[in-house]
Swiss-Prot record:
Residues 8-43, 44-79, 81-116, 117-149 form the EF-hand domain. Interacts with MYO10, the interaction is calcium-dependent and essential for MYO10 function in filopodial extension. SMART domains: EFh. Ca(2+) 4 binds at residues 130, 132, 134, 136, 141. Ca(2+) 1 binds at residues 21, 23, 25, 27, 32. The keyword Metal-binding applies. InterPro entries: CALM/Myosin/TropC-like (IPR050230), EF-hand-dom_pair (IPR011992), EF_Hand_1_Ca_BS (IPR018247), EF_hand_dom (IPR002048). Coiled coil: none annotated. This is Calmodulin-like protein 3. It comes from the Eukaryota. PROSITE patterns: EF_HAND_1, EF_HAND_2. SUPFAM superfamilies: EF-hand. The keyword Calcium applies. It comes from Mus musculus (Mouse).
Length: 149
């Protein structure tokens, strides 16, 4: 399954994995998963977190390692994101609910995830997705960015 991913995708997933793996020990615990989800405005219960980890945790050790994470991500990519999941992700970034993701909103979410980006890096990310050149990312541009990855 994971062998159908490009090197670039694997590198991106490794970076995402390291955002979750707060202590850098190579595995994601329910606590680490909860921290990231709460930083994104979600409020999962301990039981929900345990359920998510159990779903991915193939070897049954109670944590998610990188190969397990890769398998889950490649599956998720196969079941291309449902419209509702994409809308939900957009809402996480669109803090003020105006239908656009600004550089400030993108920086805010990335900082909460532990990614310290320079203004230039944030601007580059916005420019890469901003096809109509208005300086912010609307829903259609957001979808296009996700689908073209």
């Amino acid at each position: 399954m994971a062998d159908q991913l490009t090197e670039e995708q694997i590198a991106e997933f490794k970076e995402a994995f390291s955002l979750f793996d707060k202590d850098g020990d190579g595995s994601i615990t329910t606590q680490e998963l909860g921290t990231v989800m709460r930083s994104l405005g979600q409020n999962p219960t301990e039981a929900e977190l345990q359920g998510m980890v159990n779903e991915i945790d193939k070897d049954g050790n109670g944590t998610v390692d990188f190969p397990e994470f890769l398998t889950m991500m490649s599956r998720k990519m196969k079941d291309t994101d449902s419209e509702e999941e994409i809308r939900e992700a957009f809402r996480v970034f669109d803090k003020d609910g105006n239908g656009f993701v600004s550089a400030a909103e993108l920086r805010h979410v990335m900082t909460k995830l532990g990614e310290k980006l320079s203004d230039e890096e944030v601007d580059e990310m916005i420019q890469a997705a901003d096809t109509d050149g208005d300086g912010q990312v609307n829903y259609e541009e957001f979808v296009h960015m996700l689908v073209s990855k």
